[in-house]
Amino acid sequence: MASLRDIQTRITSTKKTSQITKAMEMVSAAKLNRAEQNAKSFVPYMEKIQEVVSSVALGSRGASHPMLTARSVKKTGYIVITSDRGLAGAYNSNILRKVSQAIEERHQSPDEYGVIAIGRVGRDFFVKRGIPVLLEITGLADQPAFADIQGIASQTVQMFADGTFDELYLYYNHFINTISQEVTEKKLLPLTDLQPSGKLVGYEFEPSQEEILEVLLPQYAESLIYGGLLDGKASEHAARMTAMKSATDNAKDLINNLTLSYNRARQAAITQEITEIVGGAAALE
């Protein structure tokens, strides 16, 4: 049985840990509020650019662009958005499990795929397992701007355009609410499943439809990556807040149990001392 001093030491240590997890919970809650606003405010832009792209690509006959055309798949690219830090529950493990399953099911050789890792946890996971990481970025801000991700997003889209990849998939955690995030797989390129959000709008093209698509389609694909990042950041903060709340609650339960054990041990020690005193007094009579 643990001594009173050991139990008291554990109580003190657990209280300090609970203070840390509570502080992390509050910080994550504040970050979540802003990240959720960022993700939601980006939705109208994405809806509008999708409407324009759909109208330009589908509204006129003869639209042609490599990003709109499926081709024989020799190599697949996986854009995987994870966090730079842990302590976020199953946020990272769920998405990495999903990507690993997809790679295992679709490919026989590492030559058939490559990973673009956004986030340190994902990067380290793939490198450790010998999975080829062709591009990576870590250390992104908790509230990233488009400029932070534009470089790697542009490089990734260019890798499809120049034939390095024949298709691109985007993996991220979609934010539903504070306690629910969903691992999402989205086929980024080619854009073969464009659907008009409403009635197609007619446009007059100057200089030409193809030249407009040449500029617009890469921007649209890059925006999809940025939208996934914003969604992922909101999910990360929500997952970390939930994990830290659970840790704080567990610490409180542990403190209560340890306090009960301490009181019982102290009571037993006092009872033992009284028994010894009474026994000693009886022996002197």
From Swiss-Prot:
Keyword Cell membrane: yes
GO biological process: proton motive force-driven plasma membrane ATP synthesis
Compartments where found: Cell membrane
SUPFAM superfamilies named in the record: ATP synthase (F1-ATPase), gamma subunit
GO cellular component: plasma membrane; proton-transporting ATP synthase complex
Pfam families: ATP-synt
Single annotated GO MF: proton-transporting ATP synthase activity, rotational mechanism
Coiled coil segments of this chain: none
Keywords assigned: ATP synthesis, Cell membrane, CF(1), Hydrogen ion transport, Ion transport, Membrane, Transport
Membrane topology: Peripheral membrane protein
Chief location: membrane
Subunit composition and interactions: F-type ATPases have 2 components, CF(1) - the catalytic core - and CF(0) - the membrane proton channel. CF(1) has five subunits: alpha(3), beta(3), gamma(1), delta(1), epsilon(1). CF(0) has three main subunits: a, b and c.
Its biological purpose: Produces ATP from ADP in the presence of a proton gradient across the membrane. The gamma chain is believed to be important in regulating ATPase activity and the flow of protons through the CF(0) complex.
Official protein name in the record: ATP synthase gamma chain
Source lineage: Bacteria, Bacillati, Bacillota, Bacilli, Bacillales
Gene: atpG
